[in-house]
Structures are given as structure tokens and as C-alpha cells.
């Protein structure tokens, strides 16, 4: 059976991205491969079964475009209101907290979005129902 192990994103400023993911989501380097032209840095925390791979092409000077295919990466937290306030306090400018309901009034998700230094959208969901 196949197992999802990582998702890769390209970053323009590796140090800035590392600071963001460590500060925002408590992700730390689990493995790093440095080559002459590029580096691969894998991030995870104690709760994660998979990793985010940051690929840094050292000669790149222009920001990456995300096209119209990329959606977002998602993290779940115990309390989305507290996480939202923390992101605001850190200056990460999160979007407003929203709720998603079924056709009636049952809460399906409580969430907000924030962007990393390269503009990748990240959804932060409160642990609830499907989102554990």
C-alpha cells in the first residue's frame, strides 16, 4: 500500500521560510540535503506522519508562480481562535476565521487561511469531525 510521505514546495528565501514554518507550526528540520545548486529541507513536528519538503534553488532570484492548480496545505489545531490570534500577534496577517456548515446548521469546519513567505496558502482548521 502507498503512503504519503511529503509534499514539496519551492521557496525563494530558505531562511525566511524555515523561520515561518518553525514559528507558525512548530515544524523542525528532520533531514537536510545540501548540493551545489540546491538544497532539500524536510520539516515535521511530533504530530506529523508526513513532511513538507522545502526546495531551495540557490540561483533563483524571482518569486515562484503558483499557477491555477495549487490550492493549499492544511494543518489542524486544537483551538482555531487561539491559533488565529497567535498568527496575528506574530504579524503573519491571517484571513478571518470562517465556519463551514452542512445544509442545516451542523458545523463541518472552523478555519482560516494564512500565507507563507512565498505566498503559498495554508489552511488552519480546528480539530473537529473529519479534520483530526
Stretches found by the model and what they are:
Residues 2, 8-51, 105:
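Core segments of cupin and vicinal oxygen chelate
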